[in-house]
Amino acid sequence: MVDLLSRNLYSGPRVYIRELLQNGLDAIEARSALDPDCPRRVTITIEGRTLKCRDSGIGLTEEEAAGLLSTIGASSKRDELGMARSDFLGQFGIGMLSCFMISDSITVYSRSAKSANSPTVIWQGKTEGTYTTQPLGPGDPHNLGEPGTEVVLEAHPGEPWIDPDTVRALVDEFASL
């Protein structure tokens, strides 16, 4: 079902980069409402078939990750973050589905900026519609040192949309919009 939705909502796999960038920028906008001096960055790295997109945005609590990432159509881009919906690039909370066009799973590590002691949480979703959410323990190597979110995709074997030159071109294209 998730795979079917992701393939029918988007014009093609290339939009996954746009959606990752858009989510990162929106998260930074939300964090800047709490902390105008917060760092503002979105980085994408590729190692083999693994793509990581890291932002310095507001991050998610365990409850937010379970509710927002696991419900098609859910979105944090609502007034509860203190921002009018029109302040965000993405509106519908379905952008993450585009990642399933290049990967069978999505792993999200996130640490909320709403509390100084927020733990890093991990959310893992799969194309068959299953997911898990849990906080990471203090010694876990995936703990984020600062608030924000890291999305990790393990691309399908031979997936052309993970090629570093292709990703760089897509970032350049979508960053100019």
Task: Tell where the protein language model's regions lie, with residue ranges.
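Phosphate/anion-contacting hairpin/loop surfaces
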Residues: V171
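Charged, low-complexity intrinsically disordered tails
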Residues: D163-R168
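GHKL (Bergerat-fold) ATPase N-terminal catalytic module, capturing the glycine-rich phosphate-binding loop
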Residues: M1-W161
